[in-house]
């Protein structure tokens, strides 16, 4: 519902976004569709799961009576969105992302939310975003479809994405993970798509701890079994030091 969406939008620091728009000069030649309206429209695209510019425009037009709650004077046309998507600097949206990440990260820190780990804990995963193969021929994924893959590092403390790496849709998770910036002393939790001995050795070399699901055909030998602490979680069955023996 648009009223629920409006509550989300009202959480955005409008003055911060205005200052970024001024810095990048993105409201020059705005033609009635300023930077704030553009940002809100693209966020609406994600929340409403729109698959075309027409759906964005029609969706906002259907909420004409509530647009003032979004800080928008009028709903944009399809051509307005298309023009500004092509001509408005992507640098604004990049800086906007990092500014909002910092802003909301501070808000969460000030809220006093408890976190049981002293070390930073991250979840690393990827998702496919489909694209039109005819328009984005560089992102061809299959014979008929295009796609890019987003590799996202989610901070468990703030529940916010801290780093996003974009590759072509065919890129392997383990390959792309080498370009994801993980701070030494952190814990990374990931699926078996990231189980790669070279990647794990690299993380180990920079003092990054990892929790990863192993592949079913993993070959290894047991070196030592450690005693479990008295307060070990009941689902922790065994603690072993092992050596990988596969090629």
Residue ranges of model-derived segments:
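Dynamic "connector" segments at or just before major functional cores
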Residues: 1-49, 53, 68, 72, ...
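A short, flexible helix-boundary coil/loop motif
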Residues: 1-24, 112-114, 223, 227-247
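Active-site- or DNA-interface-adjacent structural scaffold in DNA-acting proteins
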Residues: 73-138
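His/Asp/Glu-rich metal-coordinating catalytic cores
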Residues: 98, 105-106, 112-114, 134-146, ...
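Short glycine-rich loop/turn motifs
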Residues: 147-151
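An internal, acidic/charged active-site-proximal segment
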Residues: 161-247
